[in-house]
Amino acid sequence: MAFTLTILVPCMVLALVAARPVLYWVLSVVIDAFLRWKYPLPHHAGSKPMPRARYTWPNGQGTEKFFNGRSAARQWRQRWGPIYQIWSGWCPEIVLTTPTHAVQFFRNSHRHTKAVNNDSGWLFGEVLGVCVGLLSGTDWKRVRQQVEDGFSRPTAARYTGDLVFLAREYLQNTLLASSEQSLENKGIIHVEPAKTLQFYPFLSVAQILFGRLSPMQRTQLTTLAPLREELFKEVIRGGINRLSIAPWFKSRGVRLLNEFQTQWEQFVEDAYHAAVKRNQSPRPLVIGLWEAYQAGTISKRECLQTLDESLYANLDVTTHALSWNVLLLAENGEAQTELRQEVLSALQSEASESYERYIDRDDTFLAACILESARLRPILPFSNPESAPEDLYVDGYLIPANTNVIVDAQAINIDNPYWVNGTQYNPRRFFSLNKSDVRHNMWRFGFGPRQCLGKHIGERMLKAIVAEIIRQYVISISADSALKNDLQEDSWVGLPATRIQCVPVGREVEKN
């Protein structure tokens, strides 16, 4: 008997392993047929039906859209054309790839509805499903009222001085501490921007949300970051985490969720009480949000998830924007030199207010560098899904009411004929382009009235830290970086793994 089991068990295991691809294929075919029946795409007689991807078990194209989105977007566009439909889990998403299509669809975006749980399933909903950025209609207006003043352009301008100070402090302390130096190359440092610079925007936003942070609060927030990052990777991987039955299986995603939520709620409540005691101005956003929850205006989940969205959900987003800005300048010496001259000229004024206003302006070469990086390296390959309340025709194709639509950011920002030599880094292009045309031909904060709430603060953070780096260092790609555009493994936003060399400006002059 024992001998028989010794033979039988390995054979059964091998059979299951061999049968898995067949089982996945069968599931894919059956579910694809069901979804096409459930979500038909009508078309006029004599016109071509909209191209549709085949559903593949278990996430459709949902996981590929995040982890392999940039290459997938090009392949899908070449295969299916300028408008096509994919599956995010069991949810259909229509992809628009031209600015003309996007303008047509987003013309009435104030009436659009954000996709439930971002079309990413149950676990996503538990993490960010009711944050302000994913609410719609009256719920969106109700929660947005609690935070919009704190992120407005006038309020953002009040933070510029703090952001400049934090940038200088961060470079002086954190950059040097996390760099590689030697006695022979004193002052010359080697860093990986995506790892070294990530906590500057993170701590800057945390200070706006919670007020001046104590050393203990800083430690708590930065310690929570890896846990939150692992949790979101489980969200993107999908599978069982897409289903509301996931808690029954005690998956890794569920365990991480429970651990994070417990610590996050405790931190937010403690931070609220600490902020009330400090009574600082401007008033930290946590006070208004927590008091709105206590008054019953918003729920505790809406409060906690909106704070999470502003801080942790944007950690990889801001890190992506900052690190690619630095790397593109490291690759383009002429632009770097021009920017350094502009920054030094702005610093010549004795009044600190004038330098802060320089950071605020959107007509500088610094602002153009930030824009060009955002154009060339979109943070996400596709926008978040949303739907219109009525049927719409785009380029002859019918988009049925309440069908979610996403935008191929790479197609609009780079491959779009509007951008002459679109694959090349050229910040000066923005000085000769009409601002209205740029808005319609570049996907960054979204189209229409529902744009990213934090864009004004985000712009100032990027400009403050990039200006400070270029003022202090001549940067270049490190010789030991294997690939210039190598990416971190498992990064859902395409964080670069490239290292740079930073030579103090004075030392560079001496060498020359």
UniProtKB/Swiss-Prot annotation:
EC number(s) per entry: 1.-.-.-
Binding site for heme: C452
Cofactor(s) essential for the protein: heme
Pfam families: p450 (PF00067)
Keyword set includes Kinase: no
Keywords of the record: Glycoprotein, Heme, Iron, Metal-binding, Monooxygenase, Oxidoreductase, Signal, Virulence
Pathway recorded for this protein: Mycotoxin biosynthesis
Gene Ontology BP terms: small molecule biosynthetic process
CDD domains for this protein: CYP_GliC-like (cd20615)
InterPro entries given in the database record: Cyt_P450, Cyt_P450_CS, Cyt_P450_E_grp-I, Cyt_P450_sf
UniProt-recorded Gene Ontology molecular function terms: heme binding; iron ion binding; monooxygenase activity; oxidoreductase activity, acting on paired donors, with incorporation or reduction of molecular oxygen
Domain of life: Eukaryota
Glycan attachment sites: N118, N421, N434
Keyword Iron: yes
Signal peptide span: 1-19
Protein task: Cytochrome P450 monooxygenase; part of the gene cluster that mediates the biosynthesis of gliotoxin, a member of the epipolythiodioxopiperazine (ETP) class of toxins characterized by a disulfide bridged cyclic dipeptide. The first step in gliotoxin biosynthesis is the condensation of serine and phenylalanine to form the cyclo-L-phenylalanyl-L-serine diketopiperazine (DKP) by the NRPS gliP.
Family to which the UniProt record says this protein belongs: Belongs to the cytochrome P450 family.
UniProt-recorded name of the protein: Cytochrome P450 monooxygenase gliC
Organism in which the protein naturally occurs: Aspergillus fumigatus (strain ATCC MYA-4609 / CBS 101355 / FGSC A1100 / Af293) (Neosartorya fumigata)
